[in-house]
Amino acid sequence: MANNNIIKRYLVATAGLVIVAFGVALSLKSNLGTAPISCPPAILNLKFNAISVGTFTWMMHIILILSQVVMLGRKFKLSFLMQIPAAFVFGYLCDACIWLLKDVQVTTYFTQMLLCILTVIITAIGVRLEIAGNAWMLAGEKTAVVLSEVSRISFSSIKVSLDVYMVVISALFAQLAFGSLSGDGANIVIREGTLILALFTGLCMRVTDPLVDKLLKKVL
């Protein structure tokens, strides 16, 4: 995609944000566990339910951006500040998608697993659109990039470590708040779905990326 076509880039990247946000909402609805990066906002929302998942999401992203400033110092570029509007947009999109699915009833484990698998596919497509748009960048991914550059450890290793950190912190908070590592009992944030999303989203992208790229070439 041509870098000089800013409108198209932002449209594609924004479409990616919408799809990823819908994936977050689907994973929460499945009640089998959400993606590692969404675990802290989801757990905090269970304890402080007056504050939405989306609000906790953008708050977490702002903290991640501040951590980048600390790590990079003067090397922190002004262009990185575009993560701030991306954080707000993504947070409110998460809330909107959660609201859209509020009346959906999931009563069987089979249906829960179907939603989990659908979340993997949807998230893979959304992430590819974000990357293809080369406009918005969410703080989770950018923080992993910065950590990789600063530590000189591979991005994949850093990403896995960051995911594990998010899950562990969320599980510890859940244990302290609810006496359970997975959630408040009725609402599950960390379970097999978390592992499925962590392991298989990247693998799914190997299949969906060529299809998304082919579609983008036709449309754009």
Mark where each language-model region is:
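Core subunits and conserved enzymes of cellular information-processing
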Residues: A2-L220
